[in-house]
Regions:
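Structural motif
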Residues: 42, 175-188
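A short, charged helix-loop
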Residues: 162-173
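ATP-dependent adenylate-handling active sites, centered on carboxylate activation for C-N bond formation
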Residues: 1-162, 200-212
Length: 212
């Protein structure tokens, strides 16, 4: 609940602040969102986004959005983690990295309950990979191993060798980046922004006739 911080910001900048608390059981909205998005879409923040647009439409017909700020100005925590991992990658030759971090990533326990500083499984797995592959692994919900355990032989065969990594590969083909951090920013510009964030706000706002 960030409402108290929103109120503080509004007071600092002396803006007209409106606050509205919605019920957590907003399941009745899901069917409506399915119609608005008209495609498979799994970002749960579409629900509060729609509610914000709905509330804004009561006061205005056009609004400015702050979306893409984190992508443009390296605001996500995952960017900082990637930069840290990249510094470690440069310390070890690729062969040594794979030999050291692959077994660590495989056998180190997944400690979701533990303090962040001793959770290392995903980091070890990332360090065993090259930059783009490591970033894809870090932002993916389903790992390659999980997909293999879930897909039947028929499903695997129907994919005809396709791997979601190809999306990244296609965007990076022929591109060169002096800084790997710029590379993952570019990937987010090409995938995460148009495929999730911008789509979320665009469809939700159109659903209430709000121009964002």
């Amino acid at each position: 609940d960030e409402s108290q911080y929103a109120q503080m910001v509004a007071e600092v900048f002396q803006t007209k602040h409106h606050s509205h608390t919605v019920q957590t059981s907003a399941y009745d909205l899901i069917d409506k969102l399915v119609g608005l998005y008209d495609e498979p879409y799994a970002d749960s923040s579409a629900i509060p986004t729609y509610r914000v647009c709905e509330m804004a439409r009561k006061h205005v017909t056009v609004a400015l959005s702050g979306d893409a700020g984190d992508e443009c100005f390296i605001g996500y925590r995952r960017y900082n983690l990637f930069a840290m991992e990249e510094r470690i990658r440069r310390l070890f030759p690729e062969t040594l990295r794979r030999r050291v971090f692959t077994p660590l990533g495989r056998y180190y326990p997944k400690l979701d309950w533990a303090p962040r500083f001793i959770r290392g499984k995903t980091t070890f797995q990332a360090l065993a990979r090259e930059s783009a592959d490591a970033y894809l692994h870090g932002v993916s919900i389903c790992s390659d191993e999980m997909k293999k355990s879930l897909f039947s032989k028929k499903q695997t065969s129907s994919l005809q060798g396709y791997n979601s990594r190809q999306v990244f590969d296609n965007h990076l083909a022929g591109k060169e980046f002096e800084d790997p951090l710029r590379m993952i920013q570019y990937l987010d510009y090409k995938t995460y922004l148009p495929g999730d964030i911008l789509t979320k706000v665009d469809r939700a706002s159109m659903g209430v006739s709000l121009e964002v």
